[in-house]
Curated annotation (Swiss-Prot):
It comes from the Bacteria. Its EC number is 6.3.5.-. This is Aspartyl/glutamyl-tRNA(Asn/Gln) amidotransferase subunit B. HAMAP family: GatB. GO terms for biological process: glutaminyl-tRNAGln biosynthesis via transamidation; translation. Allows the formation of correctly charged Asn-tRNA(Asn) or Gln-tRNA(Gln) through the transamidation of misacylated Asp-tRNA(Asn) or Glu-tRNA(Gln) in organisms which lack either or both of asparaginyl-tRNA or glutaminyl-tRNA synthetases. The reaction takes place in the presence of glutamine and ATP through an activated phospho-Asp-tRNA(Asn) or phospho-Glu-tRNA(Gln). It comes from Ruthia magnifica subsp. Calyptogena magnifica. NCBIfam families: gatB, PRK05477.1-2, PRK05477.1-4, PRK05477.1-5.
């Protein structure tokens, strides 16, 4: 039987505020356990939550960016459940009236444009963190994360493959960084996924029983986890079994999913409005003010790169998918380099390869955008060849100096004088008269032999374009 996969994502984006959603405690990452948890975060008796207004503004900003409906009257609810890292016995979230209502995101997959619906985006507080590896027989709990503001972005079940889900997740990841509401740092847990996965016979309309995959913090793991779950469900159904609606944990080390608990329905959480918090009233003036603060969005930047800079759709898509990458590219253009295509090629080629090899983010690259732009300009003005530029790049990566200093020190400057190159071309042709005759008789492959001999005699310093031009003139 042929199966169709149905996927919806719940993305948890930590909002980049300095204090927590309902307390003044710091949100700084990596501090000593339980050093940033105040009485409100710990749910101690007699304390009351105070809403951080900045989280409202950031949620609205996201909603405006995706052209979503904004609920101008929004309320907070208590989501009741027991877990050791939830000290109050409930989580403050939003159920019936979230800040952000229906919206949509456009993705491109296999050269096809597709709309993924967004059901809602609601605010909630994060829970603490259970730490199982600190003690042999006990679990420790760090409440520093408790109360961190989250924007949970819930999609419609519109995706039909793991690859589609990853493309959508990357779009959201780029967007929250561009509008500066989340740093998107997945290593620190600032951007996490839950995936709701089901399958059904191809052509059927009714959805299958879904499972929720948790503990996913990278695009690679998201794709792996979904594919693994799809295979598991197919195996069960093809053996006449039935899928259990449950929450499953993805283990990236063992590459498996395992059951955590049966999947709760909404009524299991006994949602009700939080009596300690007033409703949030959003004025038209505030909406317009936030709309005016929106920066150039990824889709807009991509369109500009294509129309104004002449980049291909693919190149523009790659460069705009991560804000730091787009910023690096534009900084290059602001300095020495003016050839946008050449800049793009070097960022996506040599630079990306080196960053990936050394597992470094572009923000921490040892070669700054200004430094790389100088190297690109030396290629553009024919000071060095493309081959020599790769040697200069390696030296720059190893902090041996800037492009001009390395070119000078290594003697990599090309021979610019046509007269000097012409003399060498004539010498090579004279020394290889038999090959010259073969070329004139139609053996085009001999041309590469002549180029190689010339580059050898010039130690690679001859300008390849000038060599080709002179060689063709002399041979013909």
């Amino acid at each position: 039987m042929e199966w169709e996969t149905v996927i919806g994502l719940e993305i948890h984006a930590q909002l980049n505020t300095k204090s927590k959603i309902f307390s003044a405690a710091s949100t700084q990452y990596g501090q000593k356990p339980n050093s940033q948890a105040c009485a409100v975060d710990l749910g101690l008796p007699g304390v009351l939550p105070v809403l951080n207004v900045e989280v409202i503004n950031k949620a609205i900003k996201f909603g405006v960016a995706i052209n979503a409906h904004i609920n101008q009257r929004s309320i907070f609810d208590r989501k009741n459940y027991f877990y050791p890292d939830l000290p109050k016995g409930y989580q403050i979230s939003q159920m019936d009236r979230p800040i952000v209502g229906e919206g949509k995101i456009e993705i491109t997959f296999d050269d096809q444009t597709k709309i993924v619906g967004i059901t809602r985006a609601h605010l909630e507080e994060d829970a603490g963190k259970s730490m199982h590896d600190m003690f042999d027989d006990d679990t420790a709990i760090d409440f520093n994360r408790a109360g961190i503001p989250l924007l949970e972005i819930v999609s419609e079940p519109d995706m039909r493959s793991a690859k589609e889900a990853v493309i959508y997740a990357k779009k959201i990841h780029a967007l929250v960084q561009y509008i500066d509401i989340c740093d998107g740092n997945m290593q620190e847990g600032s951007f996490r996924f839950d995936a709701n996965v089901s399958i059904r016979p191809k052509g059927e309309k009714e959805l299958g029983t879904r499972t929720e995959l948790k503990n996913i913090n990278s695009f690679k793991f998201l794709e792996r986890a979904i594919n693994l779950e799809v295979e598991r469900q197919q195996d069960i159904l093809e053996e006449s079994g039935s899928i259990v609606q449950e929450t499953r944990l993805y283990d990236s080390v063992k590459h498996e999913t395992r059951s955590m608990r049966s999947k709760e329905e909404t009524n299991n959480y006994r949602y009700f409005p939080d009596p300690d918090l007033l409703s949030v009233e959003i004025s038209n003036e505030l909406l317009e003010k936030i709309r005016q603060t929106l920066p150039e969005l990824p889709t807009q930047k991509k369109a500009r790169f294509v129309s104004e800079l002449g980049l291909s759709d693919y190149d523009a898509d790659v460069l705009t998918l991560q804000k730091p990458l787009a910023d690096y590219f534009e900084t290059m253009l602001e300095h020495h380099a003016s050839n946008a295509k050449l800049c793009a090629n070097w960022i996506m080629g040599e630079l990306s390869a080196s960053l990936n090899k050394h597992k470094i983010d572009i923000q921490n690259s040892p070669i700054t955008a200004q430094a790389l732009s100088l190297l690109i300009s030396r290629i553009s003005d024919d000071t060095i060849s493309g081959k020599a530029a790769k040697d200069v790049f390696k030296a720059m990566w190893n902090s041996e100096g800037n492009a001009d200093e390395i070119i000078q020190a290594k003697g990599l400057k090309q021979m610019i004088g046509m007269g000097e190159i012409e003399a060498i071309v004539e010498q090579v042709i004279a020394n290889n008269a038999r090959q010259a005759v073969q070329f004139k008789l139609g053996n085009d492959k001999i041309f590469g032999f002549f180029v190689g001999q010339i580059m050898k005699l010039t130690a690679g310093k001859a300008n390849p374009k000038q060599v080709n031009e002179l060689l063709r003139n002399k041979l013909f």
